[in-house]
């Protein structure tokens, strides 16, 4: 039996990242934006105006249990590609959302502002509109962790920040093309059988 892996990506990261961005920056119908803009930490872009959020997938792991395997017979395919095997498995990811507030208001006031934005994002994860929004991207909300004050001083400048970790679940999908066996050799000395079964 021959096989051929397809070019399907296990996880549609583009759709997932867009869904997370839209949740924070106003892409959910019936729900106001939490911040005017958000960026992924690995993006090579200019820093947005305050307040804004930075995003990062900090963990990504497969959940326990066996993957689901489905097979489909395809018509009109060349030999060796008549069967499509789809393997699906659940995975969890942790997304760190850091809210950055304008430090011009002063250390205490700006830190409170950052924590308030994180708390608003945390509470919003229970709204039906937000739940449906993530579901449309193939995501389910597993848990939202506590809000952590991650403010710090860099080069003498106070940076007011608060971080919220969100655990999301999605599924990996991989497909493989396979074919039927052309021939099977059957041989046994006890029964005196020595034959070839042609599967074509």
What residues fall within each predicted segment?
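Residue-level signal for secondary-structure boundary sites
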Residues: 63, 105-107, 172-176
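Structured, beta-strand-rich domain cores
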Residues: 98-126
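Short beta-strand/turn micro-motifs at beta-sheet edges
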Residues: 80-87, 153-154
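Small/polar-rich, solvent-exposed N-terminal microdomains that initiate assembly or binding
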Residues: 1-81, 182-184, 189-200
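Terminal, regulation- and interaction-focused segments at domain boundaries
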Residues: 2-11, 95-100, 108
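Oligomerization/assembly interface segments of phage tail-like spikes and tubes
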Residues: 87-104, 121, 160-170
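Hydrophobic secondary-structure block in the mid-to-C-terminal portion of proteins
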Residues: 155-200
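Acidic-leaning, charged glycine-interspersed low-complexity segments
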Residues: 116, 123-174
């Amino acid at each position: 039996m021959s096989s051929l892996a397809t070019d399907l990506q296990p996880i549609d990261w583009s759709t997932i990242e867009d869904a997370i961005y839209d949740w924070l920056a106003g892409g959910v119908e019936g729900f106001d934006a939490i911040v005017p803009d958000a960026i992924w930490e690995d993006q090579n872009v200019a820093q947005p105006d305050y307040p804004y959020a930075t995003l990062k997938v900090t963990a990504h792991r497969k959940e326990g249990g066996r993957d689901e395997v489905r097979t489909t017979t395809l018509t009109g395919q060349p030999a060796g590609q008549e069967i499509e095997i789809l393997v699906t498995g659940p995975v969890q990811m942790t997304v760190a959302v850091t809210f950055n507030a304008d430090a011009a208001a002063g250390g205490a006031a700006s830190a409170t502002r950052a924590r308030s934005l994180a708390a608003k994002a945390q509470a919003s994860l229970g709204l039906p509109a937000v739940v449906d929004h993530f579901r449309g991207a193939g995501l389910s909300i597993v848990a939202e962790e506590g809000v952590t004050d991650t403010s710090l001083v860099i080069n003498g400048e106070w940076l007011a920040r608060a971080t919220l970790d969100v655990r999301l679940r999605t599924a990996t999908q991989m497909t493989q093309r396979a074919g039927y066996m052309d021939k099977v050799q059957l041989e046994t000395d006890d029964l005196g059988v020595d034959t070839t079964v042609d599967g074509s």
